[in-house]
């Protein structure tokens, strides 16, 4: 089997983006460059969304209320990823709004302690995402909420990939900078995969309106976030990549709920 093909890239992307147990053989003697494997980030995100959706379906099947089912799905995503992207969102909120200079913002973002801005952002973000999933369950059904999670988690990682490519590193010599950036061909492939999975996730319940809503909202908010990153720290870091994924996922869900 081609370990450097799309399947191998997907497994290695899961290895980076999640804590799922994966066969070690897929990581041996391969071109494991993260910027190259990143074309499969949307596929890895779709798998994570599927697993979180299954948790939501189980919660719904045993008659738990929609809020509980939504929170279980969100918790499952955080558990599978080690809250990788949520950590980035929180650190970004602390850094961007807790300091007045780029260097100080970057220092705060490296600090593992959680601050007021991070706590507030994560609480509000979790509440909004849970309410959106509840709305999908109520208006379309739990099965469509599962599909929405697949599409959202895939498309948001495609958006993260484009964001990573578009912005320079804000911290030369840092971890994100040392990994390099994905090439244009990688971004095009990843965005194509993300769009396909977003269509699979959103068209059955919300039709073309939901798909267009999601694409427009994701584009607008990620462009705005990119401008904010340039103004605050002069580029991107690993934390802002995680924040971009979280922001993109929320924008996509809002687009779907608007169409239901």
Curated annotation (Swiss-Prot):
Transmembrane parts of this sequence: 42-62, 64-84, 117-137, 144-164, 192-212, 214-234, 240-260
Record keywords: Cell inner membrane, Cell membrane, Cobalamin biosynthesis, Magnesium, Membrane, Transferase, Transmembrane, Transmembrane helix
InterPro entries for this protein: CobS
Predominant location category: membrane
Cellular component, GO annotation: plasma membrane
Superkingdom of source: Bacteria
Enzyme class label: transferase
Membrane topology: Multi-pass membrane protein
Biological process per Gene Ontology, one example term: cobalamin biosynthetic process
Keyword Transmembrane appears in the UniProt entry: yes
Enzyme Commission designation: 2.7.8.26
Subcellular location as annotated: Cell inner membrane
MF term (GO), any: adenosylcobinamide-GDP ribazoletransferase activity
Pathway participation: Cofactor biosynthesis; adenosylcobalamin biosynthesis; adenosylcobalamin from cob(II)yrinate a,c-diamide: step 7/7
Swiss-Prot/TrEMBL cofactor(s): Mg(2+)
Catalytic activity: alpha-ribazole + adenosylcob(III)inamide-GDP = adenosylcob(III)alamin + GMP + H(+); alpha-ribazole 5'-phosphate + adenosylcob(III)inamide-GDP = adenosylcob(III)alamin 5'-phosphate + GMP + H(+)
UniProt family annotation: Belongs to the CobS family.
Entries under NCBIfam families matching the protein: cobS, PRK00235.1-2
Annotated HAMAP family: CobS (MF_00719)
The protein's role, per its UniProt record: Joins adenosylcobinamide-GDP and alpha-ribazole to generate adenosylcobalamin (Ado-cobalamin). Also synthesizes adenosylcobalamin 5'-phosphate from adenosylcobinamide-GDP and alpha-ribazole 5'-phosphate.
Protein's UniProt name: Adenosylcobinamide-GDP ribazoletransferase
Species annotation: Brucella canis (strain ATCC 23365 / NCTC 10854 / RM-666)
Name of encoding gene: cobS
